Amino acid sequence: MSRIGYKEIDLPSGVEISQDGNVVTVKGPKGTLSREISPLIKMTIDGNVVKFDRDADTNKLKMLHGTTRANVNNMVEGVVDGYKKVLKLVGVGYRAQLKGNKLILTVGYSNPVEMDKPEDVEINVPDNTTIELSSINKEHLGNFAAEVRAVRSPEPYKGKGIRYENEHIIRKEGKTGK
């Protein structure tokens, strides 16, 4: 059983954390993140160390304990280093471009797919088959990357589609003729 909820979070220099009721705010060199945590989980701040504790040992509280600690740790890492995901477009004629606040994907449909850029996610298109996404919020970054990938997820026969940079696609053999 995981005991991640009991691990302490060491705050790097330049990072401030505060709690106002159930809202935790983390400020760092790259920005500020806020998140509401469960009132059943107690957070204590001792200088540069953050600890989490729970009142009871029910299964729900055990899950919330580890999840809350992981979410706050992701906030601390995000305001210090940030997060980045790279997507590759594989296929003949597949390309991406950025026009203003819209990501335009040409991925084999009759019309290009337009996606609005979220506020806290930065999009960079260094070449027309690569999309670089970066953000301080790991959750929003992962959700947007999954939305982009879902536009044309990789198929198992030729591997065409939008995939993460280091993603391995399990390939299938086609039918054999008689």
Curated annotation (Swiss-Prot):
Lineage of producing organism: Bacteria, Bacillati, Bacillota, Bacilli, Lactobacillales
HAMAP family documented for this protein: Ribosomal_uL6_B
Function: This protein binds to the 23S rRNA, and is important in its secondary structure. It is located near the subunit interface in the base of the L7/L12 stalk, and near the tRNA binding site of the peptidyltransferase center.
Family: Belongs to the universal ribosomal protein uL6 family.
Organism: Limosilactobacillus reuteri (strain DSM 20016)
MF terms in GO: rRNA binding; structural constituent of ribosome
Subunit organization: Part of the 50S ribosomal subunit.
Presence of the UniProt keyword rRNA-binding in the record: yes
The protein, known as: Large ribosomal subunit protein uL6
